[in-house]
Amino acid sequence: MKFMKAVMRMTRLRGKADLGSGPVLSTLIQLSIPSVAMVLFHTLFHLVDTVFISWLGESHMVAISYTFPVQIGVFAILEGVGNGMTALCGRRLGEGNLEEARNTALAAMGFAYLLCLIWIPFLFPYTSNIFFRTLGASDPETLRQAWLYNMWIPPTFILISFSYVVNSVFRCQGNTMIPLKYFLIANGLNLVLDPIFIFTFGWGITGAAAATFVGRAAGIVYLIKKLKTDSEIQLPFKPYIKLSMLPLWGKISAIGFPVTLSTASVALGMGSVNNILSGTFGPQAVAAWMVGLRVEDLAFNTLMGINDALVPFLSFNYGRRDLRRMKNGMRSGLIISAVITGGLGLVVCLFPFSVIQLFRPSEDIARIAANAIRITIAGYPMVIYSVIYNAFFVATGFSTFGLITQIFRSLMIRVPAAHFLSRILTIDYIWWFQPISFLGAALMTGLFSWILLRKLKRDMDDPKDPACAKDF
């Protein structure tokens, strides 16, 4: 009974969390539950979105699998800006410098808007087709469907940029409930509009992208209202870009650019694996991997929610020069991840067909996807370790360690392993390239975390002395 009361006390959501002095485990649980719920709901949305599209036919499902690298690229840029801002803004709040925290957030917003220009080529079929042909797509209908979906990225990216930075601002202040409610509004409306736009209006794959745009716009209205009432840091929706922001853009990029490259390396690695699967086993293997990734994401993305909660906690206490509290935070993050991500991973591993059948795949695709899911989840303990310590790298400004680890995993191990295994194993067992790459990343993470902890221990002998603080 006492144990249950303790669990209930730790999981009770009370608005803002006390990042600097609250009990570490309960503070991180309070931050993590809304973050995990947010990514679960977001993953569920993408799952349902993909299910609706798969009902349009196999060519549409293959087209969506080719758009994954683009979607990852979009969020790679946002993760770079968001993580760079979160690390700097959280550090300034930990130092008690609210004005500099506000300036950092404002600069991050302007930077994110400026980066929206990168996605303009996806408005045009010619440039879109060039991109997708490099990923191995050749069928004219697949290329057309991929363009119809991705042409919505440039206008939607403006809305996503605003929401991403604002949600990061709330997390820096210990508030993860408002980002959760934003996603409930945006993705809830998206789920309602998806079948209407896709089937009732007959817009097909374009309807899925249009529903995303409308849902995001509704969520933005909610965020603008909450900024006025629940945040000490105010951000305008209207673009605010000045040359005086350049120094802050440099600091954000120093932390965020390695994060962007890290996530982009995942996109490049996925595109390379798509090529290997398509060339060796045909489009059926690509479709099966897409289905497997969507189902597996139900478990894996909870880890991203815990990471999102851990970065502001670590950066705030890094600003306070409290290494002991940071170590306790990472240990607590490992415990929470083992329970939530590990538990969900086990459920998905045991019962994959319950979710796979939503896609109405052929019997062969369902069997291949189930094998891919089960083999991949075998490597989850190593993934949990790597992701938790990557949050540590980002929060302290050493995101380059995470970049090197991710490139090592995605490009130097996963792609060669997939190529080698495709020559000696059948389509049912090629998926062992995933756990192999996870093991390599965990070993690299262990080395970098040992180096960084030794450095911080030397630099932070006095945890309460802000004079030791540095920008990296």
Residue ranges: model-predicted function:
Residues G82, W152-R171, P179-N190, A208-L223, ...:
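Short runs within selected transmembrane alpha-helices of multi-pass transporters and secretion channels
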Residues M1-S32, C89-T156, T200-F257, L314-G379, ...:
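Short alpha-helical transmembrane segments in multi-pass integral membrane proteins
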Residues I53-I72, T104, P140-Q145, I205-T206, ...:
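Interfacial/gating helices of multi-pass transporter permease domains
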Residues L40, L44-V62, F131-P140, I196-W203, ...:
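Helix-terminus/linker motif at the lipid-water interface of multi-pass membrane proteins
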Residues M61-P121, I160-P179, V286-P352, V383-T405:
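Small-residue-rich hydrophobic transmembrane alpha-helices
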Residues L19-V51, W55-L56, I72-G84, L88, ...:
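N-terminal transmembrane alpha-helices
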